[in-house]
Structure formats: C-alpha cells, structure tokens
C-alpha cells in the first residue's frame, strides 16, 4: 500500500445509485445526491486515497450513460479518479470486500 500523510492510501470503489445518490431505478436524471456521503467521498479523495465510481447504468439497456453521469457527478461536486461503467446487473452481490452502504461509517 502506498503512503499518504503517514497513512496507508487505499483504493475505494463506490457504487453510485443508492449509495451516493437516491436510487431511481433507471430514471437517472431524477437522482438526488446524498450530500453527506459525497462529502465523505471527497474527504477520502482529498486525503490522497484513490476513489473509483462503479455503476451498472446502461448494463441492461445498452444505453451509454457516461456523459450524463459525468455531468451529474460534476454538478454534485463529486471528486473521483475513475468512473467505471459496466457493473453487472444483479439483485445480490456476494463479495469479500463489500460493505453495505447503509452500514458504512459515513
């Protein structure tokens, strides 16, 4: 792990819908940001950690949501290093590094 200010720099990967904004189930233009969560993401970025955003937007429809999502994130003031589209659509994710967004220490 790299060091930032004497601390380990980590790579954080955040989902978008239902994590840093409301889940609108495909009506992404209506999503509303969770300001306190975005502030936390930005603090991690400012502390030297790598912030990646990972979304399933367009996975099932084939619609390219990159430009709209980038514009939306900029409007919300989200700081990040990489936006990754193509997250598989699933009802349940089982992952050894996953943390439920409702349980995360925002």
What kind of region is each of these model predictions?
Residues 1-106:
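Catalytic phosphate/metal-binding cores of nucleic-acid and nucleotide-processing enzymes, i.e., regions
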